[in-house]
Structure formats: structure tokens, C-alpha cells
Amino acid sequence: MEALVYTFLLVSTLGIIFFAIFFREPPKVPTKKLK
């Protein structure tokens, strides 16, 4: 159970950091699928 908890926390942290950086900076790569 501990492995699942640590994995979930790691993925959540990376996801939050990724979205924070992605929304703070304008995407340099043209993303036509998102919009």
C-alpha cells in the first residue's frame, strides 16, 4: 500500500508542477488539439 501512496503523491506533484508551468508560460509548440 505504501508504494501506491508514494507513487500517487509523486504523480500528483509532477502533474501540478507541469500544469503550473504550462499555464504560466505560453505553449511554444502549436497545440491545435487542445483548443
UniProtKB/Swiss-Prot annotation:
The chain crosses the membrane at residues 3-23. One of its GO terms (cellular component) is photosystem II reaction center. It comes from the Eukaryota. The keyword Thylakoid applies. It is found in: Plastid, Chloroplast thylakoid membrane. Its main location: plastid. InterPro entries: PSII_PsbT, PSII_PsbT_sf. The keyword Plastid applies. SUPFAM superfamilies: Photosystem II reaction center protein T, PsbT (SSF161029). One of its GO terms (biological process) is photosynthesis. Keywords: Chloroplast, Membrane, Photosynthesis, Photosystem II, Plastid, Thylakoid, Transmembrane, Transmembrane helix. It is a single-pass membrane protein. PSII is composed of 1 copy each of membrane proteins PsbA, PsbB, PsbC, PsbD, PsbE, PsbF, PsbH, PsbI, PsbJ, PsbK, PsbL, PsbM, PsbT, PsbY, PsbZ, Psb30/Ycf12, at least 3 peripheral proteins of the oxygen-evolving complex and a large number of cofactors. It forms dimeric complexes. PANTHER family: PHOTOSYSTEM II REACTION CENTER PROTEIN T, PTHR36411. Found at the monomer-monomer interface of the photosystem II (PS II) dimer, plays a role in assembly and dimerization of PSII. PSII is a light-driven water plastoquinone oxidoreductase, using light energy to abstract electrons from H(2)O, generating a proton gradient subsequently used for ATP formation. Belongs to the PsbT family. This is Photosystem II reaction center protein T. The lineage of its organism: Eukaryota, Viridiplantae, Streptophyta, Embryophyta, Tracheophyta.
